[in-house]
A protein has these predicted regions:
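Core, highly hydrophobic multi-pass alpha-helical transmembrane subunits of bioenergetic inner membranes
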Residues: 1-343
Length: 343
């Protein structure tokens, strides 16, 4: 792929996402989402491998189905209300269809079937883009419609996403697929308070992106693709490996790390609205994900994988490629809990 393509594709992805978040018209938002989808396909299929081609095909078909449903819902609402504004979505059937379409775009259960396979077929940094940046545009629309979406639907999908994210990641050995199930579980936490407190949902999404990004950057810089490779990451950068351990625990929501902040705020808000049963169920189901993160921590920092004495020891990363950005994000992903009372 030539230089012009690599300049055009990231620019299209960035601008289309920004335009969706600032759009007030359904046709404009739908068009930008389509541009965003079409820009991602060359990035996914870039390795020129059958698995990458399969991932790009699955991504295209799923996103196209979601876009068709989204356009159908917007048209149905326009026929009823004679308006195309996003904030004037009032038809109940259109709201339900729009919710389903947006859930499919972000990979929430039970529409999560495509996300692990696409993440595994793409490269590490492309998978990072799918699991973080590509969620911004649909989430922005969901936050705009948060006061119109049925709370029962959101809570049902939230609990189902947390459960499926935990169960799906239990038997995984591939890091990208495991992080995809982690994304599904965190999507459930984001959806849980979207109708109650959209600002907490936005905070949860921000902290998830801030925590996931350095993990993927470390996987990319150390060429780690499986859990077995994670056990030898210390030979490349012992310091960053120790910080990575704390970042993984933060992703699991273990106090006193940053990842505990959104879960604390979400459960507190749900208890305030007398949703004790749902809050308890979410907390119990999140233990499945926490077990996965503890297993990663144990493998990366608390044990040494079997290896022969002639194993090549890299000892240090090349300082020219030292991921300083990931180091900064790791620190933020670990130490931001004390600012919670200020939020």
């Amino acid at each position: 792929m030539n230089l012009m393509s690599w300049l055009t594709i990231p620019t299209s992805i960035t601008i289309s996402t920004i335009m969706v978040t600032s759009s007030t018209h359904w046709i404009m938002a739908w068009t930008c989402l389509e541009i965003n989808t079409l820009s991602m396909i060359p990035m996914i299929s870039k390795p020129n491998h059958p698995r990458a081609t399969e991932a790009a095909t699955k991504y295209f078909l799923t996103q196209t189905l979601a876009s068709m449903t989204m356009l159908f819902a917007a048209t149905m609402n326009a026929l009823t209300t004679s308006h195309w504004e996003i904030t004037l979505l009032t038809d109940y059937t259109a709201i339900t269809l729009m919710t389903m379409a947006l859930m499919m775009k972000i990979g929430a259960a039970p529409f999560h079937f495509w996300l692990p396979e696409v993440s595994q077929g793409a490269t590490t940094m492309t998978s990072l883009t799918i699991l973080t940046w590509q969620k911004l545009a649909p989430m922005a629309i969901l936050l705009t419609l948060s006061n119109k979406i049925n709370q029962t639907i959101l809570l049902t999908m939230a609990i189902l996403s947390i459960t499926m994210g935990g169960l799906g990641g239990l038997n995984q050995t591939q890091m990208r697929k495991l992080m995809a199930f982690s994304s599904i579980a965190h999507t459930g936490w984001i959806l849980s308070t979207m109708a109650l407190a959209p600002n907490i949902s936005a905070l949860t999404l921000s902290i998830y992106i801030m925590t996931t990004t350095p993990i993927f950057m470390m996987l990319h810089f150390t060429s780690t693709s499986t859990i077995k490779d994670l056990g030898m990451m210390w030979t490349i950068s012992p310091q960053l490996t120790s910080i990575l351990t704390m970042t993984i625990l933060s992703l699991g929501g273990l106090p006193p790390l940053t990842g505990f902040m959104p879960k604390w705020l979400i459960l507190n808000k749900m208890v305030m609205f007398n949703l004790m049963t749902e809050a308890a169920l979410m907390a119990v189901m999140s233990l499945l994900s926490l077990y996965i993160y503890l297993r990663l921590t144990y493998i990366s920092s608390m044990t040494l994988t079997p290896h022969i004495n002639t194993t090549t020891m890299k000892w240090r990363m090349n300082y020219k490629t030292q991921p300083l950005t990931s180091s900064t994000l790791m620190i933020l992903a670990i130490l931001m809990l004390p600012i919670t009372p200020k939020l």
